[in-house]
């Protein structure tokens, strides 16, 4: 049996899945196939008729945001809900117990403004999760609340990058200095220093 992409066989003759290294062997793959190869245990569970555990959990820490982007469907609202910290920590414990391996902090707001954001991120990393975040980046930087000690804990960062020209700030915030260039540069530099595989997406 082969996968549709480039006819690469992923099964051994006895019907078991081949190891990732045996399948890859210098080939280039689409991101979806690469992800599949990273989770051969899930494929084996499906093959054996067992329900596989989720790979990734997304946690919306808060609906509040520190920006008021004119183009955001959540802009101009008086919302400040946030998940209680203890609930988040218990959820992380539960996710780990059922075999989840990655967590991404996201939501209708900016996750980094949760009052216990740093505590939650450290707790999740201590549990062994791969970590990601969807963020506007406004709080990331050497002179901002989220610094290297937290940035280095993330395996990937999805940073809002709506434009690089200086004038676009007027669309984004009630305060100045939110242009994404400084934040993007900071996160990229710190990731280069602290991660074997820096990964920033816009």
Predicted feature locations:
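Short, acidic/glycine-rich phosphate-metal binding loop used to engage nucleotide
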Residues: 78, 109-110
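Radical SAM/AdoMet-radical enzyme domain recognition
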Residues: 82-106, 113-202
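N-terminal pre-core extensions flanking Radical SAM catalytic domains
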Residues: 1-79
């Amino acid at each position: 049996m082969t996968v549709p992409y480039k006819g690469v066989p992923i099964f051994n003759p006895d019907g078991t899945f081949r190891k990732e290294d045996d399948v890859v062997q210098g080939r280039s793959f689409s991101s979806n196939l690469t992800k599949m190869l990273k989770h051969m245990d899930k494929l084996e569970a499906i093959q054996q008729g067992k329900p596989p555990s989720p790979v990734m959990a997304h946690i919306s820490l808060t609906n509040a945001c520190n920006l008021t982007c004119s183009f955001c469907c959540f802009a101009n609202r008086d919302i400040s809900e946030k998940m209680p910290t203890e609930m988040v920590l218990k959820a992380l414990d539960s996710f780990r117990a059922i075999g989840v391996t990655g967590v991404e902090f996201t939501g209708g707001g900016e996750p980094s403004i949760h009052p216990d954001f740093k505590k939650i991120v450290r707790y999740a990393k201590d549990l062994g999760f791969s970590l990601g975040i969807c963020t506007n980046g406004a709080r990331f930087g050497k002179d901002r609340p989220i610094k290297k000690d937290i940035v280095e804990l993330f395996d990937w960062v999805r940073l809002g990058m709506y434009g690089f020209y200086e004038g676009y700030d007027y669309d984004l915030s009630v305060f100045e200095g939110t242009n994404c260039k400084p934040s993007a540069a900071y996160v990229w530099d710190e990731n280069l220093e602290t991660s074997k595989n820096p990964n920033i997406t816009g």
